[in-house]
Amino acid sequence: MREAAERRQQLELEHEQALAFLNAKQQEIQLLQQAQVEAKKEHEGAVQLLESKVRELEEKCRVQSEQFNLLSRDLEKFRQHTGSIDLLGSSSVALLDVPLAPGKPFPQYMNGLATSIHKGHEGPTGHYSVIGDYIPLSGDKLESPCVKPSFLLRSSSPRCRFESEMDNDRNSNNSKQSSSGKVHLCVARYSYNPFDGPNENPEAELPLTAGKYLYVYGDMDEDGFYEGELLDGQRGLVPSNFVDFIQDNESRLAGTLGSEQDQNFLNHSGISLERDSILHLHSPTQVDSGITDNGGGTLDVNIDDIGEDTVPYPRKITLIKQLAKSVIVGWEPPAVPPGWGTVSSYNVLVDKETRMSLALGRRTKALIEKLNTAACTYRISVQCVTSRGNSDELQCTLLVGKDVVVAPSQLRVDNITQISAQLSWLPTNSNYSHIIFLNEEELDIVKAARYKYQFFNLRPNMAYKVKVLAQPHQMPWQLPLEQREKKEACVEFSTLPAGPPAPPQDVTVHAGATAASVQVSWKPPALTPTGLSNGANVTGYGVYAKGQRVAEVIAPTADGTAVELIRLRSLEAKAVSVRTLSVQGESMDSALAAIPPDLLVPPAPHPRTAPPPKPLASDMDTKDQHLGPHVKVDESWEQSRSPGPAHGHMLEPPDMHSAGPGRRSPSPSRILPQPQGAPVSTTVAKAMAREAAQRVAESNRLEKRSLFLEQSSAGQYTNSDEEDGYASPEVKRRGTSVDDFLKGSELGKQPHCCHGDEYHTESSRGSDLSDIMEEDEEELYSEMQLEDGGRRRPSGTSHNALKILGNSTLMGRADRMEHVSRRYSHSGGGSHRHRPAMAPSIDEYTGRDHLSPDFYDESETDPGAEELPARIFVALFDYDPLTMSPNPDAAEEELPFKEGQIIKVYGDKDADGFYRGETCARLGLIPCNMVSEIHADDEEMMDQLLRQGFLPLNTPVEKIERSRRSGRGHSVPTRRMVALYDYDPRESSPNVDVEAELPFCTGDIITVFGEIDEDGFYYGELNGQKGLVPSNFLEEVPDDVEVHLSDAPPHYSHDPPMRSKAKRKKSVHFTP
């Protein structure tokens, strides 16, 4: 029982202990439950707090999206207001038709835009390589891409800006852009750390990273800074020459990749525009598809780096495992823009041979077998197969096997010009970026998956060494150490020597500032910052019409100049071209620009102020004073490009290269053309006989001429109030050109002057002007006619006339060019006393100290002279009243004119020696000693001369006379001749006035008048048209053909000795 009681007590004690332990456990459980509840509450509170923060962030995101959309709408409105932006460079054009996929949101485009533009690097010698940094998205002028701007200084007084000329142009464009809106989106052109700059408060400026976007507000301040804001909200000052404005969403950037299929020579991402927009690049050569941009070698390819015409390519190819007989490679899918197209599969290639094709969606890995990596090297490539073609295999490639190194292989330089070249290579791994060195100086970095590079702004005829250094994205541990260390490859090349510059573009012709000129405009060719085009130093531009330079401007950047209409009309030019002038020569002609027809029509002449003329008895006798209807001007008065022979008579064609362009051919002025085809022996024999006969005739004429001059020099002059009179038989003289006449009369030689008591002066209006002597000049357009008697001079002063002795036809043809060259020289030695009106002295313009009158016409005064109609004069010299006239009112009262210009004159000259004349629809005064009269007795002849506008001074007088005689009813022998060859003067004639010659075909029968002239030409008629025909193209009609020939020798009727003739008048200013 005792044991049972002890047992029971023990059990109760254990029970109590168990209850106590249980209570303790229960309390512990309660504490744990309470802690759990508290932890749950705390968790719920934290979750609620996080949820509220998330809601706040979402709200901020929504607000920012709305702000961004608002800015996008503002940009769109701005684009609509300003219109499409014309980004025309000054030369070659790169057309980018690579728009983004339709429907792609602009914010999505902006998210990746920052990766597509990067900083450029300056070349070793001031030359800059790629045009990718050269994307001016605003303004009209483009400048060199790679010149890094100098810092802008902000100071209280004075404010200084040190910018290059290029950046000044850009900033001026930027200021125009910034003034048209409140907020503008910009992209940083260069990286900028304010603390490295020269300004005292760098904390007020924003740090910039090349290619990143930012906003600017308002206008640029006077120091050249904008107030800007980065995309992260940071605000501050932004230097204007470190940013580029983004015009609108048309200027979207998209990557364009180098591919052999589309000949894309560029090595970086490019700009993509919508399909209706074109980007014009300012570069010496045309680039096909994009603008290069310098990247840093990242492996991440943004969707926006894929252009519309670029096939997306696989990315990040990796060598997973390399075995003795096989390799395993992997890659990532391509970045395909929405709506671009579909990618159906991948092709895996080994040395350009397709080994397998994997469907899209399967694992992007491939096991390539049947390789011998221990003994051979293989190029593994992966390309995408899409609905728009396959991607470029070199954009996803790597080398495996034996002797693989990091350095690229097969460096090549192609498309070498004077200032550009294209570099290409094969990368060891498409994930590698590459650093380009030019002449041992780092030039640029080419991003991954690019293997081509374009050099620009190189120097002509210079040797370059290019080094390409590969930069692996990660260390290729699978390669041995010595193969890993081989990272660079080199190539050398030389640019071409400087060649002729490029011609201007877009040549146009429109009305000029005055009625007497037209404005020719063009777009200059692309010039480097140093003013080179194709390596040639551009100096200016020349305007050409029918191969002759009619205007010139010396300015490399000129885009237009004025051209005198008189020159164009005298050449009968319908179009003009422009050439670029340089030290190395002229460029090719630009595209022809048509001259508007309304500008070429001469203005209608003013109504005549003189009363109708009275009929004169001698009117019918002055027909011989007319210019022939076939004598026209086909070249400029200023220069003639037709060369001529050095001797007087020749039937064989002269050497066409004996005289350079721009020279007037010595007399005779007409050159016999060369017939094309087999010569006819009889024709040659007859031509030689005619030439011999001409020499004999010429010798006789010279003897008679010499005899006449001796007789005339021995004659006595009339004194008192009578004009000079001559008595001599008629002498048939050889044809002398108008230029020879002028040379023999006023300019040809130093005259024999009478000084002292032998010379008496006459005054005009009491002025002390050097006397204007007035005599009748023997008319050289007709046979020399000596007449007795004369008329009384209006002045009572008597004087002795001065004459030049010698044969004007023989007076130094060799020095004729010298005469032409010095005709425009100005001595500047004479002093003038300004009077109300003065006639300029000839000696001012010819560089001679003394000049006397030479030949004067002998004519009679008609009582009705004041009622004569308007007369036609030809200018003997160039005359510009502004620079050559001593009169103070010259600019308003006197008319300018050019040598050889036809001038319409009303009435007689006044007491001061001035005519009242009209040129270019303008009335004014004409100095009488600068012009010479040409008589035209009928309206048709006068109208023809006025329409012609110019009379070439090398027009042979005998041919003018012959043309005149052809219209008179004199008895002239005629013959019929057959043409042996086809002849078109405009194509075959070496002469200037091709309109004076007749075209004909083989077998045509031509009626010729008179004998052959000293130049080897007949005057003939064909199909009602009259003109000159070359004798060596003709043969007389055989005897068995019926022809009517005159047996009488050719002759011309002469006027009776005492017949009154209307003479040319000319006043010469004489300085004793």
Curated annotation (Swiss-Prot):
PROSITE patterns: FN3, SH3. Residues 181-248, 868-936, 972-1039 form the SH3 domain. GO terms for molecular function: structural constituent of presynaptic active zone; voltage-gated calcium channel activity involved in regulation of presynaptic cytosolic calcium levels; voltage-gated monoatomic ion channel activity involved in regulation of presynaptic membrane potential. Residues 620-635, 730-743, 754-765 have a biased composition (Basic and acidic residues). The keyword Cytoplasm does not apply. Residues 311-404, 407-489, 503-604 form the Fibronectin type-III domain. One of its GO terms (cellular component) is presynaptic active zone cytoplasmic component. The modification Phosphoserine is found at S720, S728, S852, S859. Residues 771-781 have a biased composition (Acidic residues). Residues 599-615 have a biased composition (Pro residues). Belongs to the RIMBP family. This is RIMS-binding protein 2.
